[in-house]
Amino acid sequence: MGKRYFCDYCDRSFQDNLHNRKKHLNGLQHLKAKKVWYDMFRDAAAILLDEQNKRPCRKFLLTGQCDFGSNCRFSHMSEQDLQELSVQVEEERRAREWPLETAELPEGHLEDWLEKRAKRLSSAPSSRAEPIRTTVFQYPVGWPPMQELPPSLRAPPPGGWSVLSKVQWG
């Protein structure tokens, strides 16, 4: 059995040979599915420009649905939809032009914050007055005894590892 080609746009597969693939890629269903896929990623400005240049779809206005769907040559948007879309386009344009105005910046500067933090820490009761609790290291349940573990899995000694100055590797 030969290889199969799976088309992500159409969500279907077929035997992969030059004739079948070319026939599928030039087919109306594939072209429509591909257009729908790429239309999902269009920005509001491009959609608004296209919809403003189209006349209203008579069948969509009368029945509320159109057989052509997103491939219709006419617009399925009402005047209110177009107005909302133009407001969205304007908001996106403003956000690109003035990114600092829309972003919430904290008031004050880093120096002010550091001063406040230093005052808060100095006025707060010292947490160092409390005795430091040392956690006792325990091996996980089910592990073999410490003597049987390789050195990489053993806990370090209480004083840490000794540093040897003249160590030769290799």
Curated annotation (Swiss-Prot):
<keyword id="KW-0508">mRNA splicing</keyword>
<dbReference type="InterPro" id="IPR000571">
    <property type="entry name" value="Znf_CCCH"/>
</dbReference>
<dbReference type="Pfam" id="PF00642">
    <property type="entry name" value="zf-CCCH"/>
</dbReference>
<dbReference type="GO" id="GO:0008380">
    <property type="term" value="P:RNA splicing"/>
</dbReference>
<dbReference type="GO" id="GO:0008270">
    <property type="term" value="F:zinc ion binding"/>
</dbReference>
<dbReference type="InterPro" id="IPR036236">
    <property type="entry name" value="Znf_C2H2_sf"/>
</dbReference>
<keyword id="KW-0507">mRNA processing</keyword>
<dbReference type="GO" id="GO:0005654">
    <property type="term" value="C:nucleoplasm"/>
</dbReference>
<feature type="zinc finger region" description="C3H1-type">
    <location>
        <begin position="51"/>
        <end position="79"/>
    </location>
</feature>
<keyword id="KW-0862">Zinc</keyword>
<dbReference type="InterPro" id="IPR036855">
    <property type="entry name" value="Znf_CCCH_sf"/>
</dbReference>
<dbReference type="Pfam" id="PF06220">
    <property type="entry name" value="zf-U1"/>
</dbReference>
<protein>
    <recommendedName>
        <fullName>Zinc finger matrin-type protein 5</fullName>
    </recommendedName>
</protein>
<keyword id="KW-0539">Nucleus</keyword>
<dbReference type="GO" id="GO:0005689">
    <property type="term" value="C:U12-type spliceosomal complex"/>
</dbReference>
<keyword id="KW-0479">Metal-binding</keyword>
<comment type="subunit">
    <text>Component of the U11/U12 snRNPs that are part of the U12-type spliceosome. Not found in the major spliceosome.</text>
</comment>
<keyword id="KW-0747">Spliceosome</keyword>
<dbReference type="GO" id="GO:0006397">
    <property type="term" value="P:mRNA processing"/>
</dbReference>
<keyword id="KW-0863">Zinc-finger</keyword>
<dbReference type="InterPro" id="IPR013085">
    <property type="entry name" value="U1-CZ_Znf_C2H2"/>
</dbReference>
